[in-house]
Amino acid sequence: MDNEKGLLIVLSGPSGVGKGTVRKKIFDDPSTSYKYSISMTTRDKRQGEVDGVDYFFKAKSEFEELIKQDQFIEYAEYVGNYYGTPVQYVKDTMDRGYDVFLEIEVEGAKQVRKKFPDALFIFLAPPSLDHLRERLVGRGTESSEKIQSRVHEARKEVEMMNLYDYVVVNDEVELAKQRIQSIVEAEHLKRERIEAKYRKMILEAKK
């Protein structure tokens, strides 16, 4: 591990687009070296989810106390539930040279952009809104009213993709994973990220 500061990778998109599925695919890849920043939420745990692995599940009162203590990079209330990203883990991990991967809601990503303007923002988009609705129905975890609410929110969120650096369509999970990995690799090769290191090398060579 060199002294280059880690990159903050923000993956966001509408509810039901498959953010969690794509994230799991990325982290199941043995070549992945990112550190996953686990978000905190007050929503109910879904089947198969593990506290402290997929999310930190908290009561609403606990979450609101942490907000008062300014313990989040971002937080948002979405369809009646809070979601947030604990701040200290992210800063410490990046300072150690690791890339940190955030999987968050669109509203939360807007807050991260203000605090971490140099982060890498990737919008995960559905092939279509009809496809998104089918995914939500297929979950079998929410009422038709809740699904309609999420699809309505998704329309507004798709219109906000101009706030992101890249858009990846989740038409196939493996392809989405590969596209995201390629984007991160290219981001590390940007001149702005490596120029300072080479300037320092040149100055030291002149001594």
UniProtKB/Swiss-Prot annotation:
Coiled coil: none annotated. It is found in: Cytoplasm. GO terms for cellular component: cytosol. Residues 6-185 form the Guanylate kinase-like domain. Its main location: cytoplasm. Keywords: ATP-binding, Cytoplasm, Kinase, Nucleotide-binding, Transferase. It catalyses: GMP + ATP = GDP + ADP. ATP binds at residues 13-20. GO terms for molecular function: ATP binding; guanylate kinase activity. Its EC number is 2.7.4.8. SMART domains: GuKc. PROSITE patterns: GUANYLATE_KINASE_1, GUANYLATE_KINASE_2. InterPro entries: GK/Ca_channel_bsu (IPR008145), Guanylate_kin-like_dom (IPR008144), Guanylate_kinase (IPR017665), Guanylate_kinase_CS (IPR020590), P-loop_NTPase (IPR027417). Pfam families: Guanylate_kin. Essential for recycling GMP and indirectly, cGMP. This is Guanylate kinase. It comes from Staphylococcus saprophyticus subsp. saprophyticus (strain ATCC 15305 / DSM 20229 / NCIMB 8711 / NCTC 7292 / S-41). The gene is gmk.
